[in-house]
Amino acid sequence: MTSQKHLFDLPDDIHYLNGAYMSPLMKSVQDAGIQGIKTKSNPSLLSSEDFFTLAEEVKRKFGKIIQAPANQIAIIPSASYGLKAAVDNIPSNTGDHAIVLANEFPSDYYTAAEWCKKNNKELKVIEPPSVLSGRALAWTDRILAQMNVNTCAVILSTIHWTDGTKFNLKMIGEKCREINARFIVDGTQSVGAMPIDVGELKIDALVCAAYKWLMGPYSIGLAYYSEEYNAGVPVEDSWMNKANANDFTKLTRYVDDYKPGAARYNVGEFSNPILLPMLDRALQQIAEWRADAIQDYCGNLIRPLLNYLQENAYWFEEDKYRANHLFGFLLPPSVDKEKLLHQLQSRKVFVSLRGDVIRVSPHVYNVAPDIEALIVTLKNNCQ
């Protein structure tokens, strides 16, 4: 893959290496949103079928990205909404604890903590190893060591949101299946930019906000719920998710049944005429790019930066345990953090500080000068 910067509207003097914060919209996604506004401006253009047809197409496209059937996909407004549906349907009559990671994204932690509090369960927080060598492998081992027949659920992200650490999701998923625990995963920081197969990993629920690596707008997202959830209780009772919703002439013939699969977990008003076309266009482009090609592009792009970091005593996770589109590095004592952040800002190099980690998150809109600008700024801050 070559640079796709021409599909975006980023100025040349902006070095935006911060897709994990929020992705820029492609021009085509902007256009879809503008067309959606025009459609909403003239509702006579909307038929009853329009409330459902594009939503089904979006589910189909997302299902292909994560290797899941479309009828097990739901449209959600946020990752926290999708997580709540997943966590609230964990069977509460077995087990005595749930597991999360230390320094996990707040919504993931809060959702798990609230469920544990409500159901009188312990929340086990798995800390990272204190040593940096072999850290990712040892962290996965710590998770596995805490899992047993009394584990209700393991709730974690596909990669750690602060530094891109990869966990062995396959081993964790297999052990969850073995001990009959739910495996609930937040894919917001990797799905769309890194390949994933929910069946192979034995994931029970996967939630993704769209505004990061799915390249979509804010306030919409997608979730996968396995068949274990098909009789669960949704966050809300939207008429659009009921079995007779497509026939507008019969809506007051109230029914108990939902549409099949995971449809009950759709947010109300999921057929947003502005956001949904934008997300549809973004998913189409991701499918054309392919997540594995995005990883390869980012891996080649960041190689000069990784070489510089390695040569100058910066710590970062070793290649096979770290994502290429999102990774973090620790500063050596020779670098003044506050001075560095100030110079990054003045040079229009956009990265994030998460804890003690400088997080770099490139994508296909980035080019070599973006990486070079970061390297030059780091060089200028060595004492």
Model-assigned labels for residue ranges:
Residues 1-383:
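Pyridoxal 5′-phosphate
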